[in-house]
Each structure stands twice: as C-alpha cells, then as structure tokens.
C-alpha cells in the first residue's frame, strides 16, 4: 500500500516508541515516506542500525536512545526533544516487554517493571505531547494493545495486564481529550512472526495454534500493522476515537 494512501503526513512530527522493533520498522519507514518527521525511541542498538539502513536517504528520522524504564530520564529527554522540534503531533505507544512464566513465579518487582515500560512510559509520552496538541487543536494518540487481552493465554499475566490497561487509557483519554480535537485509539495486533515469539518453547505448536484460532490462514506481516497505524494517524481517521481495532486475521471477532 502506498505510504500516502490515506493522505500525506507531511509536516507532522511523530513520537514513536519501539520504532525499530519487529512491527515498528515498517511503520516508521512508511511514515517517513509520507513526509513525517519521526522521533524513534528505541534503545536496541542492532535494531536501530537496521532502521537507519532501511531509512537511508529519507529525511526526517531522529533516533532517541532513551530508557523507558527510567521515567524521570524519559520525561527529561522527551521534553528536550519536544522543545527542539516544536512539539509532537502524533504519539504511538508501541514499546513493550513480553516475559512469560507461571504467575506465581513473577516477583512484584518484575510485574511492576512490565507496567513501567508497557504503560507508564506511554503515559509520560502523552503528558509531554499533550500541551502542544491542545494548542494545535488536533492530535493523534495510538496505543498498541494485543490480542492477548481477549483471554486464552497462560503465563503472560503482567503483559496482558499492561495491554488491557492501555485499552482503559485509550477510552479515558478519548473522552477527555476529544474536546481538543485529539483522537485516541488502540490497535490490538494478533500473533505476528517477530522476535517476541521466541519466548515460546515449542514454536511449531504455537504456530499451529495460531492457524486454528485465525479465520485467515496466513501469518500477519508488519505492513498489516503499518497500514492501520498510517490510517489512524491520518486525517482520514479524524472521526474515529476511543476504539480498539483488532488486526489479527479474524482471531477475535466483535
């Protein structure tokens, strides 16, 4: 799909966490092609290098190697960048960690770390971006949730907790920020073939389960997520807010 299918993002500045990851890279490249400036927050050096290679020759990419678990440092870094670029028009909260083990084996500290990175860091991003959005009278906030919120998953309690929290934040923010022309939506990806899958000990059995659950008999591709994020970030989605959109091949149906 062409990067400008839903209209140009030219002139928009996007704050995108986890922008160099398995699903982030494709979206970042599409948004750069559409004329956006992307502040890519990611601290994985190898993935950042791959993103920079993929974006070679395209203007607009700024990499911010910030630690999302350090909320104070994150806020300071984002406020500095916001002042330099004139504010963020679009926030995409995508970064997450994905531990897997039996619930009783998690320490409180481990569970709190998941919430800090998967939820609290996104809250900081929105708090930093919000003043500019309010003055502009428009804005887009997109939270990446997960198919796991719909149940049927074991050993992922803190991850599922964090992804359901993002749905609640999406609805609350959509109601509160709507008067300022700001839309807030969530996207719940299904099971995509990324590095996150490597936590599953039996990958063939895991993939078999995916095909049994999905209506569509193919694996999702990064472009499937990039396309919906491009749409929600664009003016074409200006009357959609407070929604959680599942992109999962028909795994969950409403």
What is the meaning of each model-derived region?
Residues 1-6, 151, 230, 241-254:
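Short C-terminal tail/terminal secondary-structure segment
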Residues 20-21:
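Conserved glycine-rich cofactor-binding loop
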Residues 75, 97-112, 155-158, 198-202:
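Conserved mid-core segment of classical short-chain dehydrogenase/reductases
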Residues 97, 104-124, 142, 166, ...:
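Catalytic Tyr-X3-Lys loop
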Residues 126, 162, 170:
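Active-site helix of classical SDR
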Residues 131, 175-176, 238:
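Alpha-helical segment proximal to the catalytic Tyr-Lys
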Residues 146:
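Residue(s) in the substrate-gating loop at a strand-loop-helix junction
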Residues 178, 183, 240-242:
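Short, small/polar-rich loop/turn modules that mediate ligand/substrate recognition or access, typified
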